[in-house]
Amino acid sequence: MAVKSSFRNMVLCLLTICFVCSALLAGVNVLTRGPIEKGRVAKVEKAVAAVLPQCNIVSERQEIEVDGVRYGYYAARQDADYVGCAIESSTIGFGGVLSLMVGITADGSISGTQVLSHSETPGLGAKCTDPAFSSQFKGWDSSVKKLEVRSKGGDVDAITASTITSRAYTLAVANAVKAFRDINASLNGDSGEEQNEITEGGQTNE
Protein backbone atom coordinates (compact mmCIF):
# COMPACT_ATOMS: atom_id res chain seq x y z
CA MET A 1 0.00 0.00 0.00
CA ALA A 2 2.86 2.33 0.85
CA VAL A 3 4.44 1.53 -2.52
CA LYS A 4 1.24 2.48 -4.40
CA SER A 5 0.94 5.70 -2.42
CA SER A 6 4.56 6.59 -3.13
CA PHE A 7 4.11 5.91 -6.86
CA ARG A 8 0.94 8.02 -6.96
CA ASN A 9 2.70 10.88 -5.21
CA MET A 10 5.62 10.67 -7.64
CA VAL A 11 3.26 10.81 -10.64
CA LEU A 12 1.37 13.76 -9.17
CA CYS A 13 4.65 15.52 -8.47
CA LEU A 14 5.87 14.99 -12.04
CA LEU A 15 2.55 16.17 -13.49
CA THR A 16 2.67 19.28 -11.33
CA ILE A 17 6.23 20.04 -12.43
CA CYS A 18 5.27 19.55 -16.10
CA PHE A 19 2.25 21.82 -15.70
CA VAL A 20 4.26 24.56 -14.01
CA CYS A 21 7.03 24.35 -16.63
CA SER A 22 4.50 24.48 -19.47
CA ALA A 23 2.81 27.50 -17.93
CA LEU A 24 6.14 29.27 -17.49
CA LEU A 25 7.17 28.55 -21.10
CA ALA A 26 3.80 29.76 -22.38
CA GLY A 27 4.18 32.94 -20.36
CA VAL A 28 7.69 33.57 -21.65
CA ASN A 29 6.47 32.98 -25.21
CA VAL A 30 3.68 35.54 -24.80
CA LEU A 31 6.04 38.10 -23.28
CA THR A 32 8.75 37.72 -25.93
CA ARG A 33 6.59 37.30 -29.04
CA GLY A 34 5.88 41.01 -29.39
CA PRO A 35 9.48 42.24 -29.03
CA ILE A 36 10.76 39.50 -31.36
CA GLU A 37 8.23 40.40 -34.06
CA LYS A 38 8.96 44.10 -33.60
CA GLY A 39 12.67 43.40 -34.05
CA ARG A 40 12.03 41.34 -37.17
CA VAL A 41 9.90 44.07 -38.74
CA ALA A 42 12.51 46.71 -37.93
CA LYS A 43 15.22 44.58 -39.53
CA VAL A 44 13.17 44.13 -42.69
CA GLU A 45 12.37 47.84 -42.91
CA LYS A 46 16.05 48.68 -42.50
CA ALA A 47 16.96 46.21 -45.25
CA VAL A 48 14.36 47.65 -47.64
CA ALA A 49 15.68 51.17 -47.01
CA ALA A 50 19.25 49.95 -47.59
CA VAL A 51 18.59 48.25 -50.93
CA LEU A 52 16.16 50.88 -52.25
CA PRO A 53 17.44 54.16 -50.79
CA GLN A 54 15.78 56.18 -53.55
CA CYS A 55 12.23 55.47 -52.29
CA ASN A 56 10.06 57.16 -49.69
CA ILE A 57 6.88 55.08 -50.03
CA VAL A 58 6.80 51.29 -49.60
CA SER A 59 3.88 48.87 -49.93
CA GLU A 60 2.90 46.24 -47.40
CA ARG A 61 4.63 42.87 -47.85
CA GLN A 62 3.16 40.90 -50.74
CA GLU A 63 3.96 37.47 -52.15
CA ILE A 64 4.30 35.94 -55.58
CA GLU A 65 5.01 32.37 -56.68
CA VAL A 66 7.59 31.84 -59.41
CA ASP A 67 8.48 28.32 -60.57
CA GLY A 68 6.98 26.85 -57.42
CA VAL A 69 8.89 29.16 -55.06
CA ARG A 70 7.21 31.93 -53.06
CA TYR A 71 8.93 35.30 -52.77
CA GLY A 72 7.99 38.13 -50.43
CA TYR A 73 8.38 41.60 -51.91
CA TYR A 74 7.80 45.28 -51.24
CA ALA A 75 6.92 47.61 -54.11
CA ALA A 76 8.47 51.07 -53.74
CA ARG A 77 7.85 54.59 -55.01
CA GLN A 78 9.45 57.97 -54.85
CA ASP A 79 6.36 60.09 -54.34
CA ALA A 80 4.16 59.15 -57.34
CA ASP A 81 6.87 57.37 -59.33
CA TYR A 82 7.35 53.60 -59.14
CA VAL A 83 11.07 52.98 -58.54
CA GLY A 84 11.32 49.22 -58.05
CA CYS A 85 10.98 46.38 -55.56
CA ALA A 86 12.77 44.91 -52.58
CA ILE A 87 12.55 41.12 -52.83
CA GLU A 88 13.21 38.47 -50.18
CA SER A 89 15.18 35.58 -51.67
CA SER A 90 16.64 32.52 -49.92
CA THR A 91 18.98 29.69 -50.91
CA ILE A 92 21.05 27.05 -49.11
CA GLY A 93 24.60 28.13 -48.30
CA PHE A 94 27.42 26.15 -46.72
CA GLY A 95 25.97 26.35 -43.21
CA GLY A 96 22.24 26.45 -43.91
CA VAL A 97 19.63 28.87 -45.20
CA LEU A 98 20.97 32.16 -46.56
CA SER A 99 18.30 34.87 -46.84
CA LEU A 100 18.73 38.16 -48.67
CA MET A 101 16.82 41.32 -49.42
CA VAL A 102 17.50 42.30 -53.03
CA GLY A 103 16.62 45.74 -54.36
CA ILE A 104 15.83 45.98 -58.07
CA THR A 105 14.97 49.24 -59.81
CA ALA A 106 12.15 49.69 -62.30
CA ASP A 107 14.57 49.24 -65.22
CA GLY A 108 15.71 45.85 -63.88
CA SER A 109 19.13 46.77 -62.51
CA ILE A 110 20.15 45.76 -58.98
CA SER A 111 20.24 48.68 -56.55
CA GLY A 112 21.59 46.73 -53.59
CA THR A 113 21.61 43.51 -51.57
CA GLN A 114 21.51 42.88 -47.83
CA VAL A 115 21.73 39.70 -45.76
CA LEU A 116 18.66 39.09 -43.61
CA SER A 117 19.96 35.90 -41.97
CA HIS A 118 22.67 33.28 -42.46
CA SER A 119 24.52 30.42 -40.75
CA GLU A 120 27.80 30.67 -42.62
CA THR A 121 31.24 30.05 -41.11
CA PRO A 122 32.69 33.04 -39.21
CA GLY A 123 35.73 34.44 -41.00
CA LEU A 124 34.88 32.61 -44.22
CA GLY A 125 31.35 32.42 -45.65
CA ALA A 126 30.13 34.97 -43.10
CA LYS A 127 32.09 37.54 -45.10
CA CYS A 128 29.08 37.59 -47.43
CA THR A 129 27.82 40.36 -45.14
CA ASP A 130 30.88 42.51 -45.89
CA PRO A 131 30.42 45.39 -48.36
CA ALA A 132 33.67 44.25 -50.00
CA PHE A 133 31.66 41.34 -51.40
CA SER A 134 28.06 42.54 -51.53
CA SER A 135 28.76 45.97 -53.05
CA GLN A 136 29.74 44.40 -56.38
CA PHE A 137 26.06 43.65 -57.07
CA LYS A 138 25.02 47.30 -56.82
CA GLY A 139 24.19 48.64 -60.28
CA TRP A 140 24.42 45.15 -61.76
CA ASP A 141 22.74 44.74 -65.14
CA SER A 142 22.10 41.02 -65.61
CA SER A 143 21.52 41.53 -69.33
CA VAL A 144 25.18 42.54 -69.63
CA LYS A 145 26.93 40.59 -66.86
CA LYS A 146 26.35 36.98 -65.84
CA LEU A 147 25.19 36.31 -62.28
CA GLU A 148 27.57 33.48 -61.48
CA VAL A 149 31.00 33.28 -59.85
CA ARG A 150 34.00 33.60 -62.14
CA SER A 151 35.10 29.99 -61.61
CA LYS A 152 31.79 28.97 -63.21
CA GLY A 153 32.03 31.38 -66.11
CA GLY A 154 30.28 34.35 -64.53
CA ASP A 155 31.29 37.86 -63.48
CA VAL A 156 30.97 37.65 -59.68
CA ASP A 157 34.14 37.77 -57.58
CA ALA A 158 33.77 34.99 -55.00
CA ILE A 159 34.78 35.24 -51.35
CA THR A 160 38.21 33.63 -50.88
CA ALA A 161 37.86 29.98 -49.77
CA SER A 162 34.06 30.33 -49.68
CA THR A 163 32.86 29.29 -53.10
CA ILE A 164 29.70 27.57 -51.86
CA THR A 165 28.57 30.64 -49.94
CA SER A 166 29.43 32.91 -52.86
CA ARG A 167 27.45 30.77 -55.29
CA ALA A 168 24.49 30.57 -52.91
CA TYR A 169 24.46 34.36 -52.46
CA THR A 170 24.69 34.89 -56.21
CA LEU A 171 21.91 32.37 -56.85
CA ALA A 172 19.65 34.18 -54.38
CA VAL A 173 20.28 37.41 -56.27
CA ALA A 174 19.67 35.72 -59.64
CA ASN A 175 16.42 34.21 -58.36
CA ALA A 176 15.27 37.64 -57.18
CA VAL A 177 15.98 39.06 -60.63
CA LYS A 178 13.90 36.27 -62.17
CA ALA A 179 11.06 36.88 -59.70
CA PHE A 180 11.20 40.61 -60.42
CA ARG A 181 10.15 40.04 -64.03
CA ASP A 182 6.89 38.46 -62.88
CA ILE A 183 6.42 41.00 -60.10
CA ASN A 184 6.93 43.88 -62.51
CA ALA A 185 4.44 42.42 -64.96
CA SER A 186 1.95 41.95 -62.13
CA LEU A 187 2.38 45.52 -60.87
CA ASN A 188 2.08 47.00 -64.34
CA GLY A 189 -1.11 45.05 -64.91
CA ASP A 190 -2.55 46.00 -61.55
CA SER A 191 -1.31 49.56 -61.12
CA GLY A 192 -4.59 50.86 -59.76
CA GLU A 193 -4.81 48.24 -57.03
CA GLU A 194 -1.12 48.65 -56.22
CA GLN A 195 -1.53 52.38 -55.74
CA ASN A 196 -4.24 51.72 -53.15
CA GLU A 197 -1.97 49.34 -51.24
CA ILE A 198 0.91 51.80 -50.99
CA THR A 199 1.43 53.25 -47.53
CA GLU A 200 3.67 55.95 -46.16
CA GLY A 201 6.87 54.70 -44.52
CA GLY A 202 9.51 52.92 -46.41
CA GLN A 203 11.64 53.07 -43.57
CA THR A 204 10.83 46.66 -43.25
CA ASN A 205 32.97 25.43 -49.22
CA GLU A 206 34.37 26.55 -47.40
Give residue spans per PLM region:
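Flexible, solvent-exposed loop/hinge segments and secondary-structure transition points
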Residues: 2-206
